Amino acid sequence: MAKEEMLEFPGVVKELLPNATFRVELENGHEIIAHMAGKMRKNRIRVLAGDKVQVEMNTYDLTKGRINYRFK
């Protein structure tokens, strides 16, 4: 079984939600709900409102995603 193709988009964190989830506004104007990737949690990388992040999303559900990088 092949791994599904993930779409990556840059965005800005708009709001912090419970359980390490965030409301992210993508550069194309859409807002999604995203959670932090496990490696970011493990390395205790903090994400705050206003941070620029990279979000990867599955092609099946374009309303949810995973934050896999925080830009410096």
Curated annotation (Swiss-Prot):
Claim: Ribosomal protein is one of the keywords in the record: no
Pfam families (alphabetical): eIF-1a
Domain S1-like residue range list: 1-72
Keywords: Cytoplasm, Initiation factor, Protein biosynthesis, RNA-binding, rRNA-binding
Any one GO CC term of the record: cytosol
Protein name per the record: Translation initiation factor IF-1
Family matches, as PANTHER family: TRANSLATION INITIATION FACTOR IF-1, CHLOROPLASTIC (PTHR33370:SF1)
MF annotations from Gene Ontology: ribosome binding; rRNA binding; translation initiation factor activity
SUPFAM superfamilies: Nucleic acid-binding proteins (SSF50249)
Matching InterPro entries: NA-bd_OB-fold (IPR012340), RNA-binding_domain_S1_IF1 (IPR006196), TIF_IF1 (IPR004368)
Gene that this sequence comes from: infA
HAMAP family linked to this entry: IF_1
Subcellular localization, as worded in the UniProt entry: Cytoplasm
Biological function: One of the essential components for the initiation of protein synthesis. Stabilizes the binding of IF-2 and IF-3 on the 30S subunit to which N-formylmethionyl-tRNA(fMet) subsequently binds. Helps modulate mRNA selection, yielding the 30S pre-initiation complex (PIC). Upon addition of the 50S ribosomal subunit IF-1, IF-2 and IF-3 are released leaving the mature 70S translation initiation complex.
Gene3D superfamilies (UniProt xref): Nucleic acid-binding proteins (2.40.50.140)
Assembly with partners or alone: Component of the 30S ribosomal translation pre-initiation complex which assembles on the 30S ribosome in the order IF-2 and IF-3, IF-1 and N-formylmethionyl-tRNA(fMet); mRNA recruitment can occur at any time during PIC assembly.
Similarity annotation: Belongs to the IF-1 family.
